[in-house]
């Protein structure tokens, strides 16, 4: 029991320490297709390093029922059936792959994001487009397409935007997608 508590304490200290790391901006990153990718967690290669990136702020539908309760919660949020939700998860995975065909920028503190797999898994933000100053945030693109909900770990954005302000902007985009019936907000069978 004592070993378990020491291990748990060590892991929690590691998570806190990684949250204090400085932001790193990784340019020229590429999406690496992988069978376990989904819309909010996917493999990337930046320079010589490959890792799984978990987006801050958003949650895309699951692609299978491995996490059945989460998938049911997602379906309820969007007012959709489980089948439609799973199909939207598959669409989100393809949407991200297609959106990230060209090099993009990852902004990360390399804070550990728990998950299955052997590769490192870090929280981060993605700027789509070659120029970070002129690019668009992937989380915003996903929400506006109706393929993600505003949920998950939030963080103050480098450059000064507070987490609360960014999340509020995402909620406005989510309402816009809902009103326009985009993505999983669109009416469908079942």
PLM regions: where:
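Small beta-barrel nucleic-acid-binding modules, primarily SNase/OB-fold domains
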Residues: 13-190
């Amino acid at each position: 029991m004592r070993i378990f508590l020491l291990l748990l304490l060590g892991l929690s200290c590691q998570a806190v320490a990684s949250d204090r790391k400085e932001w790193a901006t990784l340019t020229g990153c590429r999406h690496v297709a992988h069978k376990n990718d989904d819309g909010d967690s996917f493999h990337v290669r930046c320079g010589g390093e490959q890792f799984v990136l978990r987006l801050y702020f958003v949650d895309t539908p699951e692609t299978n029922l491995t996490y059945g309760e989460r998938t049911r919660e997602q379906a309820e949020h969007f007012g959709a059936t489980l089948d439609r939700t799973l199909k939207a998860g598959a669409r989100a995975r393809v949407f991200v792959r297609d959106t990230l065909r060209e090099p993009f920028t990852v902004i990360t503190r390399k804070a550990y994001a728990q998950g299955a797999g052997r590769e490192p898994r870090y929280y981060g933000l993605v700027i789509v487009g070659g120029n970070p100053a002129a690019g668009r945030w992937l989380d915003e693109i996903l929400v506006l397409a109706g393929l993600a909900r505003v949920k998950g770990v939030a963080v103050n954005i480098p450059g000064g935007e507070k987490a609360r302000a960014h999340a509020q902007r995402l909620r406005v985009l989510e309402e816009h997608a809902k009103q326009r019936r985009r993505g999983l907000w669109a009416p469908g069978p079942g």
